[in-house]
């Protein structure tokens, strides 16, 4: 089994419902077991900032799927929940990013792991470190909390459904 860390985000429609539906679909993946989920955080948009706020969270799983097969499964979940890729960093019903896939490193057109922007995004690192505070980034094994210490965290708040 390979330990996998995911980041989930949404800024369209009923955001909390999209996260819940994505989690339910992830729970149904073959040869995969859900281990832990973070709290949900509300954040301003990153990259293209003129859009609605996001809800973000992290998930820890273990799987026997290959990284390529796991990516196909997560993309199928995104598509089933109405994800349309119009523009980079645009609004989305759901975004499921593979942050870490065990100690493996991938740099292909389809899959880049560790996720290339994760160390620049507090909205990724805060929920991820909630799951595993001593998590290290392969292959250099630098603590992820050291990256977080250098980032602005002022626009990230714990989400509470009203």
Curated annotation (Swiss-Prot):
What are its E.C. numbers? Answer: 2.7.6.3
Pathway field: Cofactor biosynthesis; tetrahydrofolate biosynthesis; 2-amino-4-hydroxy-6-hydroxymethyl-7,8-dihydropteridine diphosphate from 7,8-dihydroneopterin triphosphate: step 4/4
What GO molecular function terms would the record report? 2-amino-4-hydroxy-6-hydroxymethyldihydropteridine diphosphokinase activity; ATP binding; kinase activity
Q: Which UniProt keywords apply?
A: ATP-binding, Folate biosynthesis, Kinase, Nucleotide-binding, Transferase
The organism encoding this protein is Streptococcus pyogenes serotype M3 (strain ATCC BAA-595 / MGAS315)
**Where do the coiled-coil regions begin and end?**
none
- Quote the catalytic activity from the record: 6-hydroxymethyl-7,8-dihydropterin + ATP = (7,8-dihydropterin-6-yl)methyl diphosphate + AMP + H(+)
SUPFAM superfamilies for this protein: 6-hydroxymethyl-7,8-dihydropterin pyrophosphokinase, HPPK
Q: Which domain of life is it from?
A: Bacteria
Q: What is the lineage of its organism?
A: Bacteria, Bacillati, Bacillota, Bacilli, Lactobacillales
Checking InterPro entries in the record gives:
Hppk, Hppk_sf
GO biological process terms held by the UniProt record = folic acid biosynthetic process; tetrahydrofolate biosynthetic process
- Homology family: Belongs to the HPPK family.
Protein name (Swiss-Prot/TrEMBL): 2-amino-4-hydroxy-6-hydroxymethyldihydropteridine pyrophosphokinase
Cited function: Catalyzes the transfer of pyrophosphate from adenosine triphosphate (ATP) to 6-hydroxymethyl-7,8-dihydropterin, an enzymatic step in folate biosynthesis pathway.
């Amino acid at each position: 089994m390979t330990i996998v860390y995911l980041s989930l985000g949404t800024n369209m429609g009923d955001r909390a419902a999209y996260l819940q539906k994505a989690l339910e679909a992830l729970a149904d993946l073959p040869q995969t077991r859900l281990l832990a989920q973070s709290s949900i955080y509300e954040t301003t948009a990153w990259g293209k900032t003129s859009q609605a706020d996001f809800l973000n969270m992290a998930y820890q799983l273990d799987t026997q799927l290959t990284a390529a097969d796991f990516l196909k499964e997560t993309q199928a979940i995104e598509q089933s929940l109405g994800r349309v890729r119009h523009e980079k960093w645009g609004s989305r019903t759901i975004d499921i990013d593979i942050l870490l896939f065990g100690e493996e490193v991938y740099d292909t057109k389809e899959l880049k792991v560790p996720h290339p922007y994760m160390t620049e995004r507090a909205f990724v690192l805060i929920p991820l470190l909630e799951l595993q505070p001593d998590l290290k980034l392969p292959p250099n094994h630098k603590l992820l909390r050291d990256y977080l210490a250098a980032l602005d965290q002022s626009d990230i708040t714990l989400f509470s459904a009203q």
